[in-house]
């Protein structure tokens, strides 16, 4: 990653931007595609095996309920930290007013597109996200990485059916999934061997894309710092505390295991793409049982978005400050509730978190046009949010595993 950063800055200095885009960036794209290629079958197979390994419906319901409750609690805590940090620092109070019009014009088209998506979601039934969990066609869902909730639903349904039928009655089917899982893990080994080159390409392309626009970073510097500080509190204080008290792992052990996962999450900005490595590090280096990690981690990829929820809270209050709006305590609570719920209902579409942020803004009366002010710096912050998301997944898996014993 460091070499990718260095090469990116070197390319900027030597005006090699076109070379990076034409000859370096494609390798990063290939690496991302390989990760996404393996993510869906891995979630399906690992979750089915995770359910089957629980051996009993009561174990599944107990662990499932515990997992969801812990995920919701950490999300509420993450949003609260974001609200507290942005309320204390007040980055919106120092945003240069002369840059508002410039940013509004630059990203207006993106805002319009996201607004249309938001309006479509608002017109749907409140239970639409539940409807969307149930696939009409399994193979269609398997061919679309954005349908991860549908894949999880089918995997849980299939796993429960296997338990009810009895694994002893269909040993060849259970053995098939176990052997398929071994093959998938070997494919993951192949992909991870390519990881250094893929990360190098991704970081080089990122620097070339963003280093030239210093204006965005100078205008949004305090806002970005607020987001980073809030995420740092979660990842450096909250998770280690939870891990130490409830997960019974030392901070050193935890971060040694999580570091490669965090690095991959930072470069890919995708929890799903990071899942293969997350499973491997959680099982082998944190000692979490396969039955727990195979269930908790795939579920967490979809519903645990601590970093994203924290970011939404900071962004909403920041925009209110920039636009001169004073939020009441009740509106703060509404942001807390909306951001928490959206962590489960975030759509699996490009810019899905931005669409959900629009709903958060709309719920408290903040003009959604203000979103244009922060879109320019969203990608770097998205990388950091993903680091928090995957770290939270690993933390919760350790807690569930420890409390199961």
What residues fall within each predicted segment?
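Helix-loop-helix junctions within the multi-pass membrane cores of secondary transporters/permeases
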Residues: 260-343, 396-397, 404-405
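Transmembrane alpha-helical segments and their short flanking loops
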Residues: 313-405
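Membrane-interface alpha-helices at helix entry/exit sites of multi-pass transporters
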Residues: 59-66, 186-190, 285-300, 329-330, ...
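Transmembrane helix boundary and interhelical junction motifs in multipass membrane proteins
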Residues: 39-43, 198-199, 270-278, 292, ...
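Juxtamembrane helix-boundary/capping and inter-helix hinge elements in multi-pass membrane proteins
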Residues: 52-59, 94, 165-171, 179, ...
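Signature of multi-pass transmembrane helix bundles
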Residues: 5-16, 32-35, 66-76, 80, ...
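Membrane-water interface of transmembrane alpha-helices in multipass transporters/channels
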Residues: 16-23, 61, 176, 213-221, ...
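Anchoring transmembrane alpha helix of integral membrane proteins
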Residues: 1-47
